[in-house]
A protein has these predicted regions:
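Active-site-adjacent betaalpha module
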Residues: 2-6, 57-198
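A short alpha/beta connector and helix-capping loop motif
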Residues: 5-8, 23-54
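N-terminal nucleotide-binding beta1-loop-alpha1 segment
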Residues: 8-15
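A cross-domain feature marking catalytic cores of carbohydrate-active enzymes
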Residues: 15, 49-52, 146
Length: 198
């Protein structure tokens, strides 16, 4: 099944000022994360950023900071353990439901998340990305953007991708996400997105 912009949310994990310089192919990863954020903004895909211990690792890099609301600050390696699931559910679930206001909560039909596809980019792939994805997979369809994630070493990054694939996460690339969001060359944002990748 193709990734739909109307059912997607983009999560940028820990792309922080003091962490990025130590990352394998960090500049390329940042460029792809920025492409995702720019396309997400064009297509009205909600963007969430996380920050791991910002007092020590710095804040989200300036290139990405303006694309999302306040970052989810965390100490757990898995953002799913520090409020990300609730945040994504709040963003993707409409406030209205078909339940009568007087109906007891235990009888009410749960509201479905209208944005269950989570697109993940960030660092480090074998720590915070991996643990966050594992924590999200029970509730969401998770797509890990392999050319927008990294670790300090290539070996750790690749081991994370092997494990994530074995666990059932969808491994994609930046261009796969962008072109699936577009579907065809007649999309109103096709030329703008095409400029992002040339």
């Amino acid at each position: 099944m193709l990734i739909e912009p109307t059912s997607s949310q983009l999560v940028l994990i820990d792309i922080q000022t003091k962490l990025l310089p130590a990352m394998f192919q960090g500049a390329d990863v940042l460029a792809n994360a920025l492409r995702l954020a720019q396309a997400a903004r064009l297509m009205r895909v909600p963007i969430t950023v996380t920050e791991q211990y910002p007092q020590g690792l710095g804040h989200t890099v300036p290139e990405l900071a303006d694309y999302a609301r306040e970052p989810l600050v965390k100490m757990a390696f898995s953002a799913a353990d520090d409020g990300l699931i609730e945040l994504l559910n709040d963003i993707g679930t409409p406030k209205a439901s078909n339940n009568a206001k007087s109906m007891p909560k235990h009888l009410q039909k749960p509201r479905e998340n209208e944005r269950p596809e989570i697109i993940i980019a960030g660092m480090e792939a074998h720590v915070c990305v991996l643990q966050t994805v594992m924590g999200l997979m029970e509730d969401f369809d998770v797509h890990v953007v392999t050319d927008a994630c990294t670790s300090r070493t290539e070996r750790n990054r690749d081991a994370a991708y092997d494990r994530l694939a074995a666990e059932g996460a969808s491994l994609v690339t930046t261009e796969m996400v962008l072109f699936e969001w577009l579907h065809n060359a007649e999309h109103e944002h096709f030329k703008a997105v095409q400029r992002l990748i040339k």
